[in-house]
Amino acid sequence: MILSNRNGLKNTRNMLRVFGGLNETYSCTEAEYSAGINFSARNFPALSTRLPRRKLREEADLNGMYHLNGLLTVCGRDLVYTPDDADEMEVTLKDAVESGRKTLVGIGTRILIFPDKLAFDTASRKVSALGAVWSGKNASVEFAPCDAEGKVYEVSGCGPAEPDKPTDGQLFLRVEDPEKPWSSESTLEVYSEASGNWSAVVLDYCRISAKGVGTDFAAEDTVTLTGSAAEQAGQWNELDGDRIVYDAGTDALRVKADPGGEWFYGRLTRTGAAVRWVSLDGSVSREFVSAEVVELERRVPDMDYLTECDNRVWGCSNKENVIYACKLGDPTNWFSYRGIAADSYAVTVGSDGAFTGAATCMGYALFFKENTLHKLYGSKPSDFQLSSLRCRGVAKGAARSLCVINETLYYLSPDGVMAWDGSIPTKVSTALDPARLRNVKSALGGALDGRYYLHLVRGSGEAQAVRLLVYDTERGLWQEEDVCSYEMAGSGGQLYLWDGKAIWAADADREESWQQAGGIEDGVSFELVSGDIGLDSPEELYLSRLTLRLEAEVKSRIEVAVSYDSGAWETLAQLTADGRRCFDVPFVPRRCGSLRLRLKGRGQLTLRSLTRTSAAAKGGILAQEVN
């Protein structure tokens, strides 16, 4: 029997098993998706929904969050600290701060809180002020020359020559100029019977005495003294100004002060506006009036952006072009200049524009403007060096987007999301719609397992648009998750997020049971719109069949829909699973130029593969063998 000729079908079959991420540009391929929410690359090369989060506790008013040996949250005016150790109790400090947004940075066991200029110690669980101010408005304050031990002397006599028969320990003021007997040119001497000689007593310190004057200060502090009236009295030429505290008690402190002035050897007492000077032997006194008030202050500069590098806290403000660094290991002292390696540091930069952020990466303290990167490096103030690079810096309002992941710094610039690894910043957001990354009102960054979380806010009021983008730094893939990130804090092994109502943990399995408040999310709502499928087919091929391989990990419901040539969505299948289950969703698409697929539902879903079957066509009919 001879069979008649049959039409020859020329079909090809391709299976797509490696999926990319979000691509909002024209170049989005069928292996990527053009829009979607709550998908991740955790099961790469498959495409899976994100892991469910765990709710830790309700919190409606959060002004800041930081992790250091535990999670510190600024709740309104209160501080709440939850230690990592489950055996330790949570600590709440009422009315510890002012209400408002906070900038937090850690150094050692302390978390610094700005603009309040406070420090929370995670070891002692106490809050202390970084700066300190003491005012002598209603106090009696005495200034007296003293030696290195803080001792103040009284003399029994003075003159151009020492007494003939002195006693052991006798004090005498040897005068060089009889017209100025109490000036610093004279010399205070003490007699030693053992040696039979007079020796000079050096009074190169000043003892400041008043009730409570030393309560808030400590040895090695640098304080700014004003209103002493010492220069007016002629006792010290430059007592007012920055002074190093060498000893501090409750009612007295000792500062370094070089001798000087025509009335040096005496005690100066201020009570309100009245000033009285009395010589060391009590024979001479002078009185006058000064309108100033005595004040001692340990100053802390106003700073908007902070970072820790090499046991120093570095900071800058968007109101001035100065970069500050605190004293080595001491964030309470910012103006200590003694010429040693532990000194504070400050430098003025010459670039234009306001600072927009600060961070630490690769051992450098980095300070950004919108078009400039300033890099500070060195081991001590004497060899600190500042270099500047004109490049795409941090966008205005995006200071908190700065985040270090695997030795690379990520941040939002006016031109998109950048990555800096020590050389030139490179753009990593080419797959995202650039228009949705511009004119950002605020941006916040976080990190977990090599993923960069970027919270963006654009516009305000009803027109406000909020997004949470996630960048897989190892694979170079972008995803988008539902917004739960108005505040973020990372611990290295966990990322804490605040959605405006409660605090969540990004990875539920890493939280101890004692921290569970609301438990794990019962399901994750997801949606995905694929890129255009079929645009790469030549004219003589068309899609004859598509098969989706889906896997539900938990109880889930899934809707599969298709859109032909950017038309309306048509439902292909509605699937439900009571537990782990795999689905094959085949369908025959109608003739079209291109199509898109949409996956929508709730639960946990993994897209394993997409199989395309293409058939040959010619002139609108199946291709036949041509003799």
Task: Mark where each language-model region is.
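Short hydrophobic/aromatic-rich beta-strand motifs
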Residues: 71-72, 109-113, 163-190, 220-226, ...
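Small/polar beta-strand repeat architecture
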Residues: 4-8, 130-131, 192-221, 226-300
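Short, surface-exposed terminal/edge motifs of secreted or surface/virion proteins that either
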Residues: 78-81, 117-133, 170-203, 234-237, ...
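Trp- and S/T/G-rich repeat-edge/linker motifs of beta-rich repeat architectures
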Residues: 40-59, 79-99, 121-154, 194-204, ...
